[in-house]
From Swiss-Prot:
An example Gene Ontology CC term for this record: chloroplast
Keywords from the UniProt entry: Chloroplast, Plastid, Ribonucleoprotein, Ribosomal protein
SUPFAM superfamilies in the record: Ribosomal protein S2 (SSF52313)
UniProt GO MF annotations: structural constituent of ribosome
Higher taxonomy: Eukaryota, Viridiplantae, Streptophyta, Embryophyta, Tracheophyta
The name this protein goes by in its record: Small ribosomal subunit protein uS2c
Subcellular localization, as worded in the UniProt entry: Plastid, Chloroplast
Family in the record: Belongs to the universal ribosomal protein uS2 family.
CDD domains: RPS2
GO biological process, any: translation
HAMAP family linked: Ribosomal_uS2_B
Signal sequence residues: none
Length: 236
């Protein structure tokens, strides 16, 4: 896997607030190698290290995308939800941005059953079948469809387990990370100063609370995935 240039700029990262961690008493000592200083009671991460790991992550996703691999992006906290959806759609990735249903990956057969039910209901709605049902039944099925859309809408075209999972918030998405570890699925994870850097395959030290920080990281990863997809299509 060759190294490429991903236009990762330290000044741009600083402007996005990527270096701001949590208050110093809410930290994981394992993050010590990634922290450069303390400022006004807050840990500051080393942006040079962040840039290196982000570049490695971009190399990895480019290489995977150029070989036709499938990606899943997960970020369910409110401030990340829209960013996750737009990034995933741009890069033609699957995504989960509302709620992670436990076992979504480890109990894949159950997820497949839910997805089939979702597809069937969507088809029935498009053909107008729901409108021909008694009002109460139609209302119940429409509510079910709305729930399935919220939880499964981003993975509706997923036909198997992903090859790489990108996780926006380690603490929030710990269940996802554990499922990936169990299944041996490689992970790329944003890690703030209260996280464990050893859990993901590539951990990117970054502020996982600021929208600008999340957006910048996802933008770089998505750009690399899109370049990889283009390379795959040309090879095909």
């Amino acid at each position: 896997m060759g190294r490429r240039y991903w236009n990762i700029n330290l000044e741009e990262m600083m402007e996005a607030g990527i270096h701001f961690g949590h208050v110093t008493n809410k930290w994981n000592p394992r993050m010590a190698p990634y922290i450069s200083s303390k400022r006004k009671g807050i840990h500051i991460t080393n942006l040079t290290i962040t840039a290196r790991f982000l570049s490695e992550a971009c190399d990895l996703v480019f290489d995977a995308a150029s070989r036709g691999k499938r990606f899943l992006i997960v970020g369910t906290k409110k401030k990340a939800a829209d960013l996750v959806a737009s990034a995933a759609i741009k890069a033609r990735c699957h995504y989960v941005n509302k709620k992670w249903l436990g076992g979504m990956l480890t109990n894949w057969s159950t997820t497949e059953t839910r997805l089939q039910k979702f597809r069937d209901l969507r088809a029935e709605q498009k053909m107008g079948k729901l409108n021909r049902l008694p009002k109460g039944d139609a209302a119940m099925l429409k509510r079910k469809l709305s729930t399935l859309q919220a939880y499964l809408g981003g993975i509706k075209y997923m036909t198997g387990l992903p090859d790489i999972v990108i996780i926006v918030d380690q603490q929030e998405e710990y269940t996802v990370l554990r499922e990936c570890v169990i299944l041996g699925i490689p992970t790329i994870c944003l890690i703030d100063t209260n996280c464990d850097p050893d859990l993901a395959d590539i951990s990117i030290p970054a502020n996982d609370d600021a929208i600008a920080s999340i957006r910048l990281i996802l933008t770089k990863l998505v750009s690399a995935i899109c370049e990889g997809h283009s390379s795959y299509i040309k090879k095909g």
